[in-house]
């Protein structure tokens, strides 16, 4: 369970509890309102019942008084003596009775009424005649009846005391009505003693009405209580289910008896721990995002560096392809380094050189230099040239070697092969490849120019047109080829590239064209895809070993042939 779900569950529980409380409050309010309404209705009913009882009581007195009502018919005979002072005596009695009724409250008029009612008959008995005594009570009684009825009608009878007083008042009125009938005034005291008895008799029905109202309330109250209990039971069951679900969602909570308070506390602790973990995870995500951005920037920088390095490597590769001679010259910056390499080659090939020394007396001179002068304009170097050279241990096989080295057909030489010429005057020849720039050649011309005669053979960049190879006018006496160099050339044939393009060479005073010049102490290295044959159609190859010639042939890019007399330390190609 996630934090949000727990919070939502807690909020849902609180919301349900609030709704349940509101419902219970509303129900309680309704119950109270109903109870109040019932009480008001009961009070109204009680008031109505009291009024009814009062009306009933008011209606009851005329029945016992009704028999004396026919008494007035006998008074008509006395009217003949009007001159008697009968009329003067009842006036004060009538005038005295209404004044205390207006000034006093409900309770005192009872006592005051007793006094005037009691006093006038005494006066009447003392002063007036017996017939006169009977008339004033008849006149006084209706007045007394009217006053209490007028007094009792406007009162709002909310309490139980008021009707009791009214009832007592009515009883007093009845007693007063009975008093004038009796001729003795002393009968008031025995009549006042039974007064409390009718009060108790009247109170009993009022209490019976209250008990009946209470009995009527109980069924309604019991029904509302049952409904309330049912709702409370449902609410508690729902809360119990909610606490059970909360307990299941919280880890590390004992399944034993646990109170709801402990469950809520553990839930709060769990929520707080989840909040802390959430904050930690947020910080971790921010840190990882920063690291990701940093690694992306570093990766972009590395890609930029790699692209730059790739560009540099590509440029170097293109430069090497286009300007390989300059790189090779830079690698062989001085001729002295070349001489060191030559010395190493000499150490490796000493037995071959020893074998070649044995074959020096048996070398065959082929064609004189006059033949080379005659055919110097028609020399063509085809693409494919083969040289078959074998090492013979004994001098008896020298004719076979010379015959194998001679081929009457056209000489096939690769187009980019470096052609090296040497003169008898110990001249130096540097042959450059087709990719060499003119600036390098000019530098070589300036550097190599000296007192001695030196020859530079340059082959122009490879094109479809033939390129002329020119040398100095001084004739070259002979070109020597050592048989050990042929084997060395075949070993290096698979390592250096071959440029099979035809090149035409014109040499006015050139007697022989050779691919390698070897010395007993030096091995010249050259690269040929196929063995080269040292012959031309009209020019033979003179294989004479020259003891003082030191030569090195490099196919690509520079071939340097140095003589001991040339200051090689001054030559440096950049």
From Swiss-Prot:
Expressing tissues: Expression in the CNS is localized anteriorly and in addition is present in the migrating neural crest cells.
Any Pfam family matching the protein: HLH
Keywords, alphabetical: DNA-binding, Nucleus, Repressor, Transcription, Transcription regulation
Annotated spans, Disordered: 17-84, 171-233, 323-353
Comp. bias intervals (Acidic residues): 34-46, 337-348
Region entry Leucine-zipper, spans: 274-302
Limits of the bHLH domain: 223-274
Ranges annotated as biased composition (Basic and acidic residues): 23-33, 47-57, 206-217
One cellular component term from this protein's GO annotations in UniProt: nucleus
Keyword Transcription regulation attributed: yes
Record's compositionally biased regions (Low complexity): 174-194
Localization terms from the record: Nucleus
Keyword Magnesium: no
GO terms of biological process kind: regulation of transcription by RNA polymerase II
GO terms, molecular function: DNA-binding transcription factor activity, RNA polymerase II-specific; protein dimerization activity; RNA polymerase II cis-regulatory region sequence-specific DNA binding
Compositional bias of kind Pro residues: 61-84
Job of this protein: Binds DNA as a heterodimer with MAX and represses transcription. Binds to the canonical E box sequence 5'-CACGTG-3' and, with higher affinity, to 5'-CACGCG-3'.
Subunit-structure text: Efficient DNA binding requires dimerization with another bHLH protein. Binds DNA as a homodimer or a heterodimer with MAX.
Protein name: Max-binding protein MNT
Native source species: Xenopus laevis
Lineage: Eukaryota, Metazoa, Chordata, Craniata, Vertebrata
Gene: mnt
């Amino acid at each position: 369970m996630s934090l949000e779900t727990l919070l939502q569950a807690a909020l849902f529980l609180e919301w349900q509890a609030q709704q349940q409380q509101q419902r219970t409050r509303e129900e309680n309010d309704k119950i109270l309102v109903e109870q109040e309404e019932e009480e008001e209705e009961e009070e109204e009913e009680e008031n109505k019942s009291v009024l009814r009882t009062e009306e009933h009581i008011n209606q009851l007195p005329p029945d016992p008084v009704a028999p004396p009502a026919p008494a007035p018919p006998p008074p008509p005979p006395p009217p003949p003596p009007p001159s008697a002072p009968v009329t003067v005596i009842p006036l004060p009695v009538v005038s005295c009775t209404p004044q205390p009724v207006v000034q006093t409250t409900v309770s005192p008029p009872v006592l005051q009424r007793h006094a005037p009612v009691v006093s006038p008959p005494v006066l009447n008995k003392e002063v007036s005649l017996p017939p006169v005594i009977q008339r004033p009570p008849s006149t006084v009684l209706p007045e007394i009846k009217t006053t209490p009825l007028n007094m009792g009608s406007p009162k709002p009878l909310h309490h139980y005391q008021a009707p009791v007083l009214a009832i007592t008042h009515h009883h007093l009125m009845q007693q007063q009505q009975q008093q004038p009938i009796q001729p003795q005034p002393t009968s008031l005291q025995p009549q006042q003693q039974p007064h409390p008895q009718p009060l108790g008799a009247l109170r009993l029905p009022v209490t019976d009405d209250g008990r009946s109202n209470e009995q009527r309330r109980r069924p309604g109250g019991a029904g509302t209580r049952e409904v309330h209990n049912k709702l409370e039971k449902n609410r508690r069951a729902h809360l119990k289910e909610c606490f059970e679900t909360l307990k299941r969602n919280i880890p590390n909570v004992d399944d034993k008896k646990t109170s709801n308070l402990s469950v809520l506390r553990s839930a709060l602790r769990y929520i707080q721990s989840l909040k802390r973990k959430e904050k930690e995870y947020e910080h971790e995500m921010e840190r990882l995002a920063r690291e990701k951005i940093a690694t992306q920037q570093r990766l972009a920088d590395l890609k930029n560096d790699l692209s730059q390095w790739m560009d540099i490597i590509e440029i170097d590769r293109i430069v090497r392809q286009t300007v390989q001679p300059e790189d090779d010259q830079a690698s062989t910056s001085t001729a002295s380094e070349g001489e060191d390499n030559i010395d190493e080659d000499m150490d490796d090939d000493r037995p071959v050189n020893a074998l070649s020394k044995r074959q020096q007396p048996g070398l065959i001179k082929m064609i004189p230099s006059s033949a080379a002068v005659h055919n110097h304009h028609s020399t063509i170097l085809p693409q494919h040239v083969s040289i078959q050279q074998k090492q013979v241990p004994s001098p008896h096989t020298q004719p076979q070697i010379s015959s194998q080295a001679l081929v009457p057909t056209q000489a096939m030489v690769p187009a980019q092969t470096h052609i090296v010429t040497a003169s008898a005057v110990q001249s130096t020849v540097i042959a450059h490849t087709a990719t060499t720039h003119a600036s390098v050649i000019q530098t070589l011309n300036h550097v190599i120019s000296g007192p001695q005669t030196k020859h530079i053979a340059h082959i122009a960049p490879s094109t479809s047109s033939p390129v002329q190879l020119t040398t100095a006018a001084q004739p070259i006496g002979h070109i020597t080829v050592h048989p050990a160099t042929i084997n060395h050339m075949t070993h290096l044939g698979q390592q250096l590239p071959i440029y099979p393009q035809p090149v035409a060479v014109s040499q006015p005073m050139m007697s022989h064209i050779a691919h390698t010049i070897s010395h007993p102490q030096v091995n010249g290295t050259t690269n040929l895809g196929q063995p080269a044959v040292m012959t031309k159609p009209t020019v033979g190859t003179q294989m004479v070993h020259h003891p003082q010639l030191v030569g090195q042939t490099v196919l690509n890019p520079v071939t340097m042939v140095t003589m001991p007399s040339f200051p090689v330390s001054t030559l440096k190609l950049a």
